[in-house]
């Protein structure tokens, strides 16, 4: 991050509770160390920066513990500094699922099973894996009427792709090399190559692709490292695409150096993409 970016899709595992006693409003929040990736630090103590905001929507005002705004060029650096014990732990979350769909009209029954694994190896390393994911529980996108010549950008709300995705961002939020919403998007077709089945191919085109698996590894340190891979399932009259991304990033004094490489294998069209 450049110190002033916000992520509205961040949905970490934290707990909070509020109460009113003697006319005073209290709020307590439990934030586990595993909530975010942090660079490895030597020694028994770790220094971190924090700030707290409270928004009063009724009057359109916000109150903060710091003298700074996300709209200013300098933001994270003005956070208050705290020192804690240098704790490092590991956490493993496993979310299996199974679904059964019964189509009475076509007398068709479809069953699916899969799982998502989130392994926080330590404070700086994390490995995420999803097998045959089901993203049916993800909230729908807002309706946007767009008459411009440019495509509307929708952020990815799927948990696997949303978590630690900022590792693969470059420059600012308006300059995106990777759009994970493409993964699992509309399949590629070449119906003209199927002869007598061309019309049937046109009629059975799918709007989305199933994902066989996806893997993401991120590591924070002197050199930040990230790798992501995803493979789509072959559909009727279509072959799934394969996606790869590699990210390296480091800082030296006031300069930041980075590399982002992406590759997409498109077996149907043969137009493989490499950036």
Positions of predicted regions on the chain:
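Short, intrinsically disordered, charge-balanced linker/junction segments flanking boundaries
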Residues: 271-275
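Short acidic loop-to-helix transition motifs that present clustered carboxylates
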Residues: 266
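Conserved catalytic alpha/beta cores of large enzymes that bind or transform nucleotide phosphates
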Residues: 262-263
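Structural preference for beta-rich elements and adjacent junctions enriched in aromatics
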Residues: 1-250, 256-259, 269
